């Protein structure tokens, strides 16, 4: 959560507390992507989903927001048309506080996905848990699926997919250089 009383560096978003784009976010995801989705908690307990764009043109598409348990059950869903306005950070949707307070914060997360007609996709996940609540989260046993593709005689691509949310997946690659990307 991005709250005034919890300014822990790993919790920072791409918006400051005035709802304006934040430059400090560039060293993370925004350094690689011109458009991102981010979340901003309000004092009434609701959550605003922002679309941030550094491009010179608007992007029309569809926004889907899902409140999902770690087992994969969708508890709440919102689907609507949205526009990522050029060179700005604009509110795209609001998740009401009544929706967020209806479930324990450690059992689910919010996923926001923006897609357009060119099949571009932006995705971001917001965990409702506070810093000290991760010990209450009970993640189900995941069914990991791994695909390995040879890129060249000395390069391969490893794709890991799962049926539910997972954390702490460990990949060991011995005696070789490893380049990691989680941009999918």
Predicted features along the sequence, with ranges:
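Carbohydrate-binding surfaces of carbohydrate-active enzymes
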Residues: 1-184
